[in-house]
Amino acid sequence: FATEGANIAFTDLVLNDDMAAGLEATRKEIEALGVTCRAYAGNAADFEETEKVVKQIHADFGSIDVLVNNAGITKDGLMLRMSEAQWDAVLNVNLKSAFNFIHACAPIMLRQRGGSIINMSSVVGVHGNAGQCNYSASKAGMIGLAKSIAQELGPKGVRANAVAPGFIETPMTAQLSEEIRKDWMKKIPLRRGGQTEDIANVCLFLASDMSSYVSGQVIQVDGGMNM
């Protein structure tokens, strides 16, 4: 987004000095690309806190044209062994946060008579995954939320879509055993994992006018794993 000239506002949960330093480091990295970037500390799962953050962002930037809902955690476990706390934590961060931000940003976009909302889902939100019922449910919810918002806000020019990444090469997936990685690759026709840039490129398309007639859709970025 920044390389295409978009000004960036992003939020993250800050619980200690190290997290605050990470927030500032990311802000500087983005701003070095020649755009305005501001970082905001906040708990996306908190409804009132999110409203305050969005009001501040709107005051600082003057408009909110694109919203990417990308907050996410995992607390995996088989359903019968999963605690209520595990379920609630994942649904609150992964799904409720998206509702909170959409609820706060939608009035601004409606007044602007335009905007693009992008929900980060997952292929497990499409077909499920054993041991991840909470995560799968949250990501399926992101799809349903995007489709519903697309219908509600579409008449005023606001679009909403979901992106469903598959196996993406990240520091988290790099920690998986070689056996698990090989098993994943067998399921992917392209026989490789995706890169974070693959996801960013699809989000950039959905944010831009190139997708001005695309709304209520789920774009799977998974190398053909889920057809």
Task: Give each language-model segment a name.
Residues F1-F61, K75, A85-Q86:
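Short-chain dehydrogenase/reductase
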Residues L78-M79, Q86-L91, W184:
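Substrate-binding pocket helix/loop in short-chain dehydrogenase/reductase
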Residues M82, G128-S136, S148, L176:
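Active-site loop-to-helix junction immediately N-terminal to the catalytic Tyr of the SDR YXXXK motif
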Residues I102, S138, A146:
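Active-site helix of classical SDR
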Residues P107, Q151-P155, S212:
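Alpha-helical segment proximal to the catalytic Tyr-Lys
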Residues S122:
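Residue(s) in the substrate-gating loop at a strand-loop-helix junction
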Residues A162, M185-M210, V214, V221-G223:
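C-terminal helical subdomain
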